[in-house]
Structures are given as C-alpha cells and as structure tokens.
Design a protein with these regions (language model features):
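N-terminal ligand-binding lobe of clamshell/alpha-beta domains
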Residues: 1-278
Length: 278
C-alpha cells in the first residue's frame, strides 16, 4: 500500500485526510500488480481505523479478482485482550496455532511480571496520552488500558467496566475494562485537566517527526502552563514502533509505562524509540 496524503505537518495531514474522507476519496492505494504477482493465499488487513490503512472494501474487491482467491482476514481489535486473540486467529489461519499460543503465553507472562511493580488499588499519576498534536487527539482503545494497568489514570479518555463486570478492579478485573476510540479535544481541556505526566506518541510519525511536532506544540502560549511541562514529566515516543499498532509490541509499551511512571528504568526494554522532553 502507499499513502495518498502528501501533507507533512500534523495540521495539514488532518485537513487533507478529512477533506478526502468527506469526498469519499481513498487515502491509500494498493499495488494490484505486485499483489497479483505475490499470489497470496491469505491477506491480512485491518478494519479498525480507516485513516491508518487501506479501506477493507478495497482489499476485498481486489482480492476477489486474484486467481488464487485469497482469504482476507480483517482484524479489528478494540482492546489489549483482542490484540492477543488476533494472534491466535492468525496462528490458526496459517497452521501455527501451537506457536501462537506459546507467543501469547510469553506475552501474558511479561505483562504479569511488569504489573508486579504496580499497586492496582492505589491512585496513581494522571497521564494524558496524545496520539496527534494538531488537533490534539487523546489516545483510545488499548492505550488507556495500558496506562491504567501501569498504575496511572487516563482521565481524558478512561476505561469503563464492560457490562456485568462490576467494579472491574485489580489485576484480573482490569481485563474487564475498555475505553472508546481516540478523541479530539481543544487545548483548553488539556490545560484544565493538568495531567501529572504527558506522553506524546503521534500515530504514524517517527520519533524525529514527533520531536518536530512537539516543538511546534511548545510554541503555544498555554504549553508552559501545564504541570507536566513545568515538572519535566513529558515523554515522546515513536507511536508506530510500540504504541499505535495492535501487535506484540504493546507489551513493550506496558513495560515502558511501568518503568517510566515508577522510575524503574531497568524495566524499559532496550532499543525502544522514546526520549524525554525537552
């Protein structure tokens, strides 16, 4: 696939994407010739975010024209648990169910190990996770889950217990909580919330791009009024590397959050693309 968005700044990208979607224009193109040459048996795509990847209907249409008539598997995980379930779905699809189960077990063990450093019943710091900077979008889906399981709060888009889950507290109960989609907020709402810590991991942006995005954001008159800015509790991350994509690296994200929020740097996996700001 190849993006059709040509803008480079967050505001311009958002404007161009909104305009294209309003006119029912695609945001991505698929190399049909290359796909045909590859002759896949299975095509894995996603139906979670129409801005992040090619439209599912387009993939299905093209797949139907291929001689191999590949099976299209569309993933749509809304929660961290659903991300792990999708690993099993893919493992079963390619005849590697045993390996998928082993991978899931390993990932869950890492989650439990990280959470041993967290008191799930104590009120932690409030965190604002920005997955876009202009306009400001607050992270949703699995991101609030990870933040809360790392012992913090995500008040601008918190999780809620699923129906019938009661309070859904504690290490096990928290698996019965989920959040909605990412939400756009005006800067005034961010300022009013005065988060203790701010994590900025723009969707689809590299760490260098995130650095430039935050540099522009920091020129806003309200930026220095934020408590997290004044106390040096702002971190940048390559969102694609370990936050925005629904895959195994979400466990890296949880380990990072526990290490960063609780001042335990040894818990942060080596090689993660993140840095403190400024």
């Amino acid at each position: 696939t190849k993006p059709l968005i040509t803008a480079t700044t967050p505001h311009e990208i958002d404007t161009q994407a909104r305009s294209a979607m309003a006119e029912h224009q695609p945001l991505y193109t698929l190399d049909e010739q290359l796909l045909g040459d590859l002759a896949p048996d299975i095509i894995v795509t996603q139906d979670l975010c129409h801005v992040c990847s090619i439209d599912l209907a387009a993939v299905q249409r093209i797949a139907a024209t291929l001689p191999t008539k590949p099976r299209v598997i569309a993933l749509n995980p809304q929660t961290f648990e659903a991300v792990l379930d999708d690993l099993l779905t893919l493992g079963q699809a390619i005849g590697r169910e045993h390996q998928a189960l082993a991978t899931i077990t390993n990932l869950r063990n890492r989650v439990y190990s990280a959470q041993e450093f967290v008191n799930p019943f104590a009120a932690g710091e409030s965190v604002a996770m920005l997955e876009w900077t202009d306009p400001i979008f607050i992270g949703g889906h699995w991101t609030p889950q990870l933040i809360e399981r790392a012992g913090a709060l995500h008040p601008l888009n918190p999780t809620q217990p699923v129906k019938g889950a009661g309070a859904a507290q504690g290490p096990i109960g928290m698996t019965q909580r989920q959040a909605g989609k990412s939400i756009a907020i005006p800067p005034e709402v961010l300022v009013a919330s005065q988060p203790d810590a701010i994590l900025i991991a723009p969707c689809g942006r590299s760490l260098a791009q995130a650095r430039n995005d935050v540099l522009e954001l920091s020129k806003s008159p309200w930026w220095p009024t934020l408590k997290a800015v004044r106390t040096g509790r702002v971190a940048l991350a390559d969102g694609n590397h370990f936050f925005n994509r629904p895959g195994p690296r979400l466990v890296d994200a949880l380990e990072f959050l526990v290490g960063w929020l609780h001042n335990r740097p040894a818990l942060i996996p080596p090689g993660l693309l993140w840095e403190k700001w400024p």
